[in-house]
Swiss-Prot record:
The lineage of its organism: Bacteria, Pseudomonadati, Pseudomonadota, Gammaproteobacteria, Enterobacterales. This is Putative general secretion pathway protein B. It comes from the Bacteria. It is found in: Cell membrane. Residues 110-121 have a biased composition (Acidic residues).
């Protein structure tokens, strides 16, 4: 700031205009260079930001979707807690020995009989799983 005053005083004393004009031009060049550097920096920040967004949207998202589409193993909802163990063997549940009760409780058709057998096997399997889970929790 004081350089201009000093240069103006020297110009008045010597009558030589070259020093003042040279300093004026050098400050304009400095300002232009500073503006160019600021514009370059802002451009790099913008380009980097857009490049990162494109990377996240196209490349990373594509990698995640490929992994999600092809699982390494088949997921089973049948036996969630016992994936590493085989399913327990289902033991048949014996009915009461009284024939009168057995006749009253007999299913009306073969389809009902198949359904009740499947349901009893499922219940026995579920009971077995619950017992195994409780035993594992106690250990």
């Amino acid at each position: 700031m004081f350089e201009f005053y000093i240069a103006a005083r020297e110009q008045k004393e010597t009558g030589h205009p070259g020093i003042f004009s040279r300093q004026k031009h050098s400050t304009i060049i400095y300002v232009i260079c500073l503006l160019l550097i600021c514009l370059w920096f802002a451009g790099m920040v913008l380009v980097g930001g857009y490049a990162r967004q494109l990377w996240v949207l196209w490349i990373v998202k594509a990698e995640v979707t490929v992994e999600a589409e092809t699982p390494a193993f088949k997921q089973s909802t049948q036996h969630y807690f016992f994936k590493k163990q085989p399913l327990p063997v289902v033991e048949s549940v014996e009915e009461e020995d009284d024939p009168g009760v057995a006749v009253e409780n007999a299913p009306s058709s073969s389809e009902d009989e198949e359904n009740t057998v499947e349901e009893s096997e499922e219940k026995a399997g579920l009971r077995e799983r619950v017992k195994n889970a409780l035993n594992e929790l106690e250990r």
